[in-house]
A protein has these predicted regions:
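Flexible "cap/lid" subdomain of the alpha/beta-hydrolase fold that forms the substrate-access gate
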Residues: 5-37, 41-233
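Catalytic active-site module of serine/aspartate enzymes centered on a nucleophile-bearing elbow/loop
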Residues: 227-262
Length: 262
């Protein structure tokens, strides 16, 4: 049985609630402001916290996911896939209870396979499910089981992650994926807004999130949305989880950025 102290309502995971949580943590720590860092889905959270709570945020760093501004058009709400359509994990997440049940039943398999699939150079066995159609099954068996864990992931760390997810379950995290359209509806005031604070973006060169974009391409994408972007850094040979695959380099970049602040 999962033990959780996070909200159950899907809409409680919208971007405004999450940004308010970050601002609330700063207040709870009895600090006036802070520099914040977020990776993957944490990056949109810190970007939006900087926009929505400028008085609380001195500077901001995003890893993997670059801020691209508020879209002109409302995102379509993903719908459950037709069973004959090609499997897509975000669509799989839209049907409440389905993905959670699969992941909660075997968190170790999910985490080990997912981390290996995002770690260049880690060998994996062929996936059990090779049929691309949604009807063929869920996500875990579409990911190859790693021959061994990625070099940056120890058995001890994996066991810790698994034990924590056994307590919390995956529903909260998956609910994040169910709020794309609501996030847009809740943030009309951000139309055309730029992040004013000093900012840094770091990504692995091989991170699939950025689809092979070069540093110049990422800088061009970022330019309209930042007032003081102090760097776009691609870490050579690194994949999605750059803070774990390249901790020393990531820490160096963060320390240099902090040193550049007034």
């Amino acid at each position: 049985m999962c033990i959780r102290d996070s909200p159950f309502a899907t809409e409680d995971y919208n971007i405004k609630e999450l940004a308010a949580d970050v601002a609330g943590i700063i207040t709870a720590l009895d600090e006036e402001s802070a520099v914040i860092v977020g990776h993957d889905w944490g990056a949109p959270v810190v970007w939006h916290t900087a926009l929505l709570y400028p008085e609380k945020i001195d500077a901001v760093v995003g890893l993997s996911v670059l801020y691209g501004g508020r879209s002109e058009n409302k995102p379509e709400r993903p719908v459950r896939q037709d069973p004959e359509d090609e499997f897509f994990y975000i669509s799989y997440f839209q049907d409440p209870g389905v993905a959670e049940a699969e992941f909660d039943a075997d968190p170790e398999a999910l985490i080990a396979r997912l981390y290996a699939s995002r770690s260049p150079g880690t060998p994996v066995h062929p996936p059990e499910i090779t049929d691309a159609r949604a009807i063929a099954g869920g996500w875990i068996k579409r990911l190859g089981e790693p021959v061994h864990l990625p070099a940056w992931l120890s058995e001890r760390d994996l066991k810790y992650y698994v034990s924590e997810f056994r307590k919390s379950g995956f529903e909260g995290g998956i609910n994040y994926y169910r709020n794309g359209a609501l996030n847009w509806e809740l943030t009309p005031e951000l139309d055309g807004s730029k992040i004013q604070q000093p900012a840094l973006f770091i990504a692995g060169e091989l991170d699939i999130v950025n689809r092979g974009a070069t540093q110049d391409e990422l800088e061009l994408r970022a330019q309209p949305h930042f007032e003081d972007l102090r760097g776009v850094v691609l870490q050579p040979g690194i994949g999605h989880r750059n803070q774990q695959q390249a901790p020393e380099d990531t820490n160096r970049l963060l320390i240099e950025f902090l040193g550049s602040l007034n």
